[in-house]
Amino acid sequence: MSVGLFTVLRDRNARVYLTGVIVSGFGDSAMLLASGVWVKELTGSDGLAALVGFCAWAPVLAGPLLGNLADRTRRRTLLIATSLVLAVVMTAPAAVRSPGDVWLLFTVLTLVGAGTVLTDAAETALIASAVPGELRGDFNGLVRSAVESTSLLGPLLGAGLFTLLGGPAVALLNALSFLLAAAAFWRIRTRETAPVRRPRGSWAAETVEGVRHLWRHPTLRPLVVAGGCAMVASGLSSTATYALLDTGLRRPAAFAGVLTSVQGLGSVVGGLTAGAFLRRLPVHLLSALGLTLFALGALARGTGLLPVVVLGSLLIGLGLPWPLIGALTTVQKETPEDLLGRVAATANTLVFAPTGLALLAGTALVTTVDYRVQLLAAAGLGVTVAALLAVRGRPAPFRPPT
């Protein structure tokens, strides 16, 4: 199981890129946590503090449009330029001093969110040419593990730095992380082909071309939809956490950190093992297995028994990355290079945009129904999608329209 991981780590491009992911991930997660605390301290408003997360999430809705840019330019150049621009943008929060300045923070976070959508699409396309195909499953799993690790440790760094030096220091740290990411992208060596020169249609028409490819593809569509359903189920499960602690476990809210850490540990393990499973299982079965583990974890969290709840959090973390990694790896494999930026961005929108809606729905549900109903709904969604993936079997080869 470790052979593929060691092979990936021996690949120079993979090592350089992973370094950039870890550094920028620390900066982004630290800044997101610090921004919420910063807005809360300046305004005293819980609603405005919550708006921080919305600003970072909202640009994912424009993914198909932003992904178009990743197909019009060289991806490595685009990644370097975008990272440098975001480094400059992230210096602006140093001017935030009063409640009247929080609009600047919201603007910066929205721009960074848009930049993240763009870089995610360009990275997916660049990796398809920079990392050998047989290593992409392991590589994408390592990236997911790196993201999960930074999302666990980055907020601790952000909270500590904010307490010691204030919000501007965290913003400057994030700016530095963008500079280091740009340096990592610059060090990637790949023979990237120039964008296809052809008569350009309208931006909307080219965007639709990417959406059409994904939606008509018999392999991509179900895997991407399954990834989106996994994130919806995750949103329903996570919003029940505090009700679970209060009503089910009778533990303080701070105990959520324990469950989050256990789930994060499971996600790291899930990412590290994804490549090995992809070599042994068809991708639709791996996605189905991940969703099944998630469903079992959600059911376990509904028992109200502490050891079982902890085990359930571990199962959720273990299973959730597999449908996401399976969808991403298949997008890279099944998409023509000149469409890859648009298709990758569209896939990310379909997978991650529903998360925000699920969080809103879950927040409303948890105030009106027993938290176990919410966990049962999350488990039901997971096992239903898993069954559909398993039953449909391996799809027929895709033949693009002529």
Model regions: which residues?
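Helix-loop boundary and gating motifs at the non-cytosolic
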Residues: S2-A58, R212, R216-Q263
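Hydrophobic alpha-helical transmembrane segments
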Residues: R15, T19, A50, I80, V102-G113, T119, D138-A194, S237, ...
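Substrate-agnostic recognition of the 12-TM MFS/MFS-like secondary transporter fold
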Residues: V16-L32, C55-N68, R74-L86, L104-T163, ...
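C-terminal transmembrane bundle of multi-pass solute transporters/carriers
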Residues: A50-V52, L61-L66, A70-R72, R76-V85, ...
